[in-house]
């Protein structure tokens, strides 16, 4: 599907024009109240394991930012030198492609626990498993990694295309049908997650020479309770690796609070956050302009409606506010999960299509 490039009027209605979440230099005290037109859903699981609310995603990105590869300011996939010490790739005789990654030593989660290679791999093994599907997660890693389908179907005990080489080195092998791919660096945009936090003490990642697998009580019953807690937890015990820690979420007011993670090593440019606290709150279409002018919040994001853009420009003309305009490459799509759930049935998909 063709990507549409649209111009969006944005996010930067700041009372102080210099207040940027990723400014260089010494941390400056202060709080930004971020007004979001999309309410927080409260599902803070990695990526879109279950849901993918836009504001939830923004919070996830602020709390999990240690991707091996990331997109730069121009939208190009680049290697993240904060995380990756070395990356090598080779196209195999069967057409598959193997990426071998060595991460930097000394990286830690917000709780001080050291990040190692296994932290990047277990979630990929999880994405290849029937256990993920049993918990309702919408993950399809078995369609990307060599050996993933065999692991998913139970004909193999490990994912052969995911290898734990040593404490700081791992490799992933991508199926030949997925190669070549212009954006293949995205295949190694893996982020570290604490296995203990997400799946509990009863499991561990292992590689006995044939590929990675999750050992222990790796069943729906064995991990579901901890997964549920980890998804929705917002507190001091939440383990993450990003510029901010999610320390509170009020379901009644739909307000989340994030504070600086002092253990954060920096983004791909080495930048660290300068705003001490970010409060994310729900705004209303009918009242956002007045709320902004009276100081209820001081940052309003992603203004795309023509009338709202004109209102925003009027506020800026009055003084005390500024804006940032940015490009967005994106498209809208409605797709069906066809291998399980109600939409596995053709009649259901046809019925939904007839409603459009």
Regions from the PLM with identified roles:
Residues 35-92:
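N-terminal lobe/hinge region of extracytoplasmic solute-binding protein
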Residues 33, 116-123, 167-171, 243, ...:
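Alpha-helical secondary-structure segments
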Residues 232-235, 263-311:
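Ligand-site clamp/hinge motif
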